[in-house]
Structures are given as structure tokens and as C-alpha cells.
Amino acid sequence: MCYKFYNIMVIKSLQTLVSESLKEIKTINADEAFQMVQDKNCNLIDIRESNELENTGKVEGASHIPRGMLEVYLDPNSPIFQNSQIDQNKEFILFCAGGVRSALAVKSLKDMGYQKVSHIDGGFGSIASSKFKII
């Protein structure tokens, strides 16, 4: 008897990836993030693309690491590790435009071994309507 095995590729949707990530990561709101920034207990990291910052403004006090470079910049073995820009002893709070990319990014950082990471629900949209200053 001969058996044929077929490789069937299963593609997960973006919504599935985000839903799975949200079950494993810490989500905070903009007011909680603002208080942590005021208390100097975190690294606020904007993972939006440069053109997004140019179009909508920057969040005062946030470091900018584009989503596409996040793992490279935060890999201690990378030649462009951003150790001087980021305090490794403080929580990383990530945000993007709406919260999708930051949820996936936080999951990725957790997979890399980072423990104190969270993202802001609603991203820049919720930040812009909070106490944060947009410059």
C-alpha cells in the first residue's frame, strides 16, 4: 500500500495572530502609560514608520524604533543594538497607530526573552486624546 502525504499550508489571518498575541501580552490604556512615563518607570517606544510621525506628530518623550527594525535594535547581539537609547531595567511600553502592530511587536519581544513589555490599547489614537503632548 502506498500513502501520499500532502503538505497543506495553513495561513493564519492577521486577526487570529493579534487575538492570540493579546492573550499572552500585557495591555494598558493611555492614562496608565502616561502615569508610568510621569513616574519615569518605563521606556515609551513609538514603533510607527517615520512618515506616520511626520504626518501625525510625535509623542513627547517617546523613543522611535520603527516596527521593521525593533527586533534588530533590541537584540543584544546585533551590531546596532540600541542599549544607550533604552533602559533595560524599565518596562517597555510600545505603541503604533491603532494597537495592532504594537500587540504583535510585544509578543515578538516576549518571544525574544523580554519580560517587562506592554502595549497601549488603541495606539496613537488613544494617546492623542489623552494627557500626552504631541509635538
Residues covered by each model-derived region:
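Rhodanese-like catalytic fold shared by cysteine-dependent sulfurtransferases
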Residues: C2-C42, S50-E91, V100-I135
